[in-house]
């Protein structure tokens, strides 16, 4: 949608801030720990391989990566056990929000999330209350120059569903979408065709996006997203709203 910044693009901006804060190290390390449960060899574990590549991209030292793999695969036992949990809730104006968390204490995480929602005009709901508004997809992000005919051909070969050209200040490239079960195949095909892949991920994609034009609602939503993202147990946040770039700049000033 021209002139608008989708939540995925807002998340990219936040990711850069998180990287400066060092917060991204902890989140990616946790992804490695969970992925390594299915096997410590990245050659046979696509989820682990993807997490390791992301860790290297953000500059996590190899020693930290190896330690996370050892912890996840059971070679290093510190007594803690991370659990993957999905939470769902509503922001100001009924905006749907999905939170993916990794936690060793689900009671603590639920309490922290409930507090963040309550303080920022939202409420934590029951599992399933908003996830029906989203589909989970596999997404391959491509940066750099590309030939669109070659991209279309590779997307068909890799069994992609569709792709979107992204032209934002913080990201110039293409996002290619597929079924989650086909993500490994698609990323491999695109890599073999020589495309510059910046990220491979699973993402919740909303069927219908709500445009937020009211400044107070937008401010409340962004404060809620920040509060949720600041929680150590939170790995990923997805919401079904857009905010016009002009309004975003006004709120940031």
UniProtKB/Swiss-Prot annotation:
GO BP field: regulation of DNA-templated transcription
Subcellular location, record wording: Cytoplasm
SUPFAM superfamilies: YebC-like
One Pfam family this sequence matches: TACO1_YebC_N
Any one GO CC term of the record: cytosol
The keyword Cytoplasm is annotated on this UniProt entry: yes
Keyword check for Electron transport: no
Keywords (A to Z) from UniProt: Cytoplasm, DNA-binding, Transcription, Transcription regulation
Molecular function terms from GO: DNA binding
Family: Belongs to the TACO1 family.
The protein's name in its UniProt record: Probable transcriptional regulatory protein Tery_2125
Organism: Trichodesmium erythraeum (strain IMS101)
Lineage per the UniProt record: Bacteria, Bacillati, Cyanobacteriota, Cyanophyceae, Oscillatoriophycideae
């Amino acid at each position: 949608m021209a002139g608008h910044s989708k939540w995925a693009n807002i998340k990219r901006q936040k990711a850069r801030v998180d990287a400066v804060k060092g917060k991204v190290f902890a989140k990616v390390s946790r992804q490695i720990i969970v992925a390594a449960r299915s096997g410590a060899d990245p050659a046979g574990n696509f989820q682990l391989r993807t997490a390791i590549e992301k860790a290297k991209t953000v500059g996590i030292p190899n020693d930290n990566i190896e330690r996370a793999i050892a912890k996840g695969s059971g070679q290093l036992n510190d007594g803690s056990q991370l659990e993957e949990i999905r939470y769902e809730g509503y922001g100001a104006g009924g905006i749907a929000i999905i939170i993916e968390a990794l936690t060793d204490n689900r009671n603590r995480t639920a309490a922290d999330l409930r507090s963040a929602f309550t303080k920022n005009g939202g409420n934590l709901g029951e599992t399933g209350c908003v996830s029906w508004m989203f589909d989970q997809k596999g997404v391959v992000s491509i940066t750099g120059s590309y030939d669109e005919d070659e991209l279309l051909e590779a997307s068909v070969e890799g069994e992609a569903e569709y792709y979107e050209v992204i032209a934002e200040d913080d990201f110039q490239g293409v996002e290619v979408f597929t079924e989650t079960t086909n993500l490994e195949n698609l990323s491999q095909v695109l890599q073999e065709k020589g495309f510059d892949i910046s990220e491979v991920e699973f993402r919740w994609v909303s069927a219908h996006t709500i445009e937020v034009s009211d400044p107070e609602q937008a401010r409340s939503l962004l404060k809620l997203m920040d509060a949720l993202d600041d929680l150590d147990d939170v790995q990923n946040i997805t919401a079904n709203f857009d905010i016009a770039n002009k309004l975003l700049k006004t709120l940031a000033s």
